[in-house]
Amino acid sequence: ANGDLHIKIVQKQPIARVINKYGVNYYINENANKIPISSKFTTRVPVVTGNIQEGTYNSNMIETPVLKNVLTITRFIHNNTFWNAQIEQVSVADNGSFVLIPKLGDHKIEFGGIDNMEEKFHKLEIFYAEGLSYTGWDKYETIKLDYKGQIVCEKKINYEQE
């Protein structure tokens, strides 16, 4: 009771930047909080776009089922050193499935839903290490993970191996 005031400040760490269907931008953190965008600072995190339907920025918490799935997949990416370095964008398709855009390579990853998420990422990591390192990062247009136990790739139409 000596008149001292103690303040504890905890900075929220964003794991993704969301741009919803209506163009509203905000960050999300691991605790399912929405964080307003700052005009003075940008955090390097994956950008999430696509069919994210919600109203205006009126709630500070993630509440819709689509956003809960976004949180699940972006939390996994954020906490995995390999995928955090690889994934640049996460897009939500109209049916709620995910399409991942990597930083390296000129392909998209049709991830599907978050069911068996860890297994899908594990198989994709093996494919990156044992497949793409031999065939090249630009051979495929699409890598599809939404088939149980399989990775299906579509070659680029005009791909020519050097």
Language model: regions and residue ranges:
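Charged, solvent-exposed interaction patches on well-folded alpha/beta domains
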Residues: 1-162
